[in-house]
Amino acid sequence: MNLVTRPGRVGIMGGTFDPIHYGHLVTAEAARWEFALQKVIFVPSGRPPHKKDYPVTDAEYRYQMTLLATASNPYFEVSRSEIDREGFSYTVDTVAEFRREYGPEVQLYFITGADAILEILTWKDVDTLLRECHFIAATRPGFQLNRLEESRPQLPVEGRHRIHLIEVPALAISSTDIRWRVKNNKPIKYLLPEAVEEYIRSRGLYRPRLDGVYEKG
């Protein structure tokens, strides 16, 4: 794939981004390059249905951290689509919103992890999703591709060719680990952009209060 960006290809990267880190950014840039995407739109989730029983940091904080993390890349944008929407954040609703905005000619590419793709049959209105957009499944070195291939026959026939694999560098970074490190006064430098690190510290995010409740989310 050359450096020339094909018009009419837009990437969508959803996630809680609690907090956003270099793993997210590397994945988005790898997908943009490999699939010649015009841009990648980061969509912090509002109320993710798969995490309804887990505490998630206030959406405005996560949105601001995502803005800070993506500011240096002119091909990255951040959308308030899900955090301003009432109710649970379903991917099919987000894709429909971008389809209305960009029209029928633009190809939409939803970027996610390969592990998430393995659960795609449980997603709301999966048939509609696979008609409206392509999926880029980011794998790590050592990921067992046969797991994905075994699930492909269960997908709607017209959607099987819309799932693409891309291998990204093995960055052992997770939002869960970053939250744990902040809580336990461990360093998080080089795990996420410096501006995000400073935002976390200045807002007191991920630190427990004396009553055991996490400060601000």
From Swiss-Prot:
One of its GO terms (biological process) is NAD biosynthetic process. Gene3D superfamilies: HUPs. The keyword Nuclease does not apply. Its EC number is 2.7.7.18. Pathway: Cofactor biosynthesis; NAD(+) biosynthesis; deamido-NAD(+) from nicotinate D-ribonucleotide: step 1/1. One of its GO terms (molecular function) is ATP binding. InterPro entries: Cyt_trans-like, NadD/NMNAT, Rossmann-like_a/b/a_fold. It catalyses: nicotinate beta-D-ribonucleotide + ATP + H(+) = deamido-NAD(+) + diphosphate. Keywords: ATP-binding, NAD, Nucleotide-binding, Nucleotidyltransferase, Pyridine nucleotide biosynthesis, Transferase. NCBIfam families: cyt_tran_rel, nicotinate (nicotinamide) nucleotide adenylyltransferase, PRK00071.1-3. Belongs to the NadD family. Catalyzes the reversible adenylation of nicotinate mononucleotide (NaMN) to nicotinic acid adenine dinucleotide (NaAD). HAMAP family: NaMN_adenylyltr. This is Probable nicotinate-nucleotide adenylyltransferase. It comes from Moorella thermoacetica (strain ATCC 39073 / JCM 9320).
